[in-house]
């Protein structure tokens, strides 16, 4: 018997709800009350904040226990309640997959590059204005070769940008190598738990925990797509490894060629998606949103968000696929481990891949996911703009 049910009522659940049920209810209620969906409601932010606070308490076992026993006055987070919008993005921004895929920050590197070019463009414009002022002060007595000066300036700027991009790329590669090592270690731990479960005849318990984790991962941003990506990479790498052992390495020639062909296809798909989105964005930039009614504006913004999501997902997927392949290679090609053990690890990967590939969404969940991912994108863009302004 709980002292009060206000937080449970806000999320529309019973006091005996499981952690997964609480998270699902929070996502649904957060989408229903999100201020972006209620621009004309002055109380929208307060309602959204209330949903966030209810979840912050009920998702924390310690705070939930205090709330159930003593009520909400005794169940306040030590650091206070977080801002609902930032909390919403943090909870569903992909962190749940961290042990499987590492860093999943949409467009992080692209944003950094864009900021760098934007900053240097501003500096270049300011320098040009200063030069023009100097020229006018000389009363036209000293003339510069403007075209040559501009050309030299652009060459210099391009060199600086190239150096910074090379620096960013070097850092990205170092981060990637570190992530691959960490992810390989974590995947090895999961594989070991599977192998122990098989040997001890306790596979049912391992499967139950994995199924529960899959249910939670489905709630993440691009959750189902990430599960399918993991399944495809694990299955491909594991099957290729097992086949190479059966054919004494001869099949590696064919599987390697096939993998390279897939990589080329992925790169082509990424380029096509980017070009298609760019054309759509250019057309949309000609639209005057002030002339649209509320319904048309909502439809326009939804289309824009959808195009942006498509490009962001394509870029992230391409990068993730390469990272996951490196993780699998690190485990399966570790010569310090006997071949027989590595084959067993490959079979464990196939088991996990099968479970991930079996994940499904109902039509209602699919529509929820679409709306939800657009909201996540909106919050990430707001956060990015806020930090840009702060600088």
From Swiss-Prot:
It comes from Saccharomyces cerevisiae (strain ATCC 204508 / S288c) (Baker's yeast). Signal peptide: none annotated. Keywords: Chaperone, Isopeptide bond, Ubl conjugation. Residues 119-161 are annotated as: Disordered. It comes from the Eukaryota. InterPro entries: DnaJ_domain, DnaJ_domain_CS, DnaJ_X, J_dom_sf, Peroxisomal_DnaJ. Residues 4-73 form the J domain. This is Protein CAJ1. Residues 129-161 have a biased composition (Basic and acidic residues). GO terms for cellular component: cytosol; nucleus; plasma membrane.
